[in-house]
């Protein structure tokens, strides 16, 4: 993998992370608006519900990113294995040519 490809993948990953962070912030604002209408903003239960909701959203984000990275690793491993098989076949074919 070239340096440029690694940089582009890194920037792409950061961009996706920022989008996910923005989505979490948006969900939090909607949730906080709902909670402020139903609960008092300075009550104990409001703080507890807000903390639990934040933890659940970040847990979902972490699991999603972990799943995506595992799928990418599996795809890269399979591609590397098939490339090695092709190289081995070509070297075997070149070695077994009649002289």
From Swiss-Prot:
Residues 90-99 have a biased composition (Polar residues). Residues 73-89 have a biased composition (Basic and acidic residues). The chain crosses the membrane at residues 46-66. Pfam families: Pox_A9. Residues 67-83 are virion surface. Residues 1-22 form the signal peptide. Induction: Expressed in the late phase of the viral replicative cycle. Residues 73-99 are annotated as: Disordered. GO terms for cellular component: host cell cytoplasm; membrane; viral envelope; virion membrane. InterPro entries: Poxvirus_A9. It is a single-pass membrane protein. Glycans are attached at residue 88. Keywords: Glycoprotein, Host cytoplasm, Late protein, Membrane, Signal, Transmembrane, Transmembrane helix, Viral envelope protein, Virion. Its main location: virion. It is found in: Virion membrane; Host cytoplasm. Residues 23-45 are intravirion. It comes from the Viruses. Envelope protein. Required for an early step in virion morphogenesis. Belongs to the oerthopoxvirus OPG135 family. This is Virion membrane protein OPG135. It comes from Vaccinia virus (strain Copenhagen) (VACV). The gene is OPG135.
